[in-house]
Amino acid sequence: MREAVVAGALVVAGLNAVPSLVGGWVWYRGERADPGLARLFWLMLRVGQGSAVAFALAVGSLAAAGHTASESLFYLYALLPLAVAFVAEQLRVASAQTILDQRGLPDAAAVGQLPEQEQRVLVGAILKREVGVMSLSALVVVFLALRAAGTAHGF
């Protein structure tokens, strides 16, 4: 049983490492980044998040069936990625408002009143910040999943 839990944690780490690296590249390149790569980042990020949810459900099912880890830290590492993803999504939403506030715009509707070039610059800044936040969250999930794999004892 331990091998399956470790394998699951490693799959979660791998599925989150890829969007973390791709997102870091997209963030670094900014507006020069390939739009297809940016779309791929969001798809891979959601797959990574889904894997973390599936792993948490599997671990919860094992615990409900009486197969528990001997080290309670394992559960922290296995379940914390869900909280990280939730907080990251909130930060992603707040990052858009932060950019609007920096430019003195009250809401997203005000962006439509700007000239097209300014709209593009503003949207690019928002997307860059969102990608940065989410790729860092994926990196944190990688760390937590690797720690879960390292503490999966007693199954």
What role is predicted for each listed range?
Residues 1-155:
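Polytopic transmembrane helical bundles with strong interfacial aromatic enrichment
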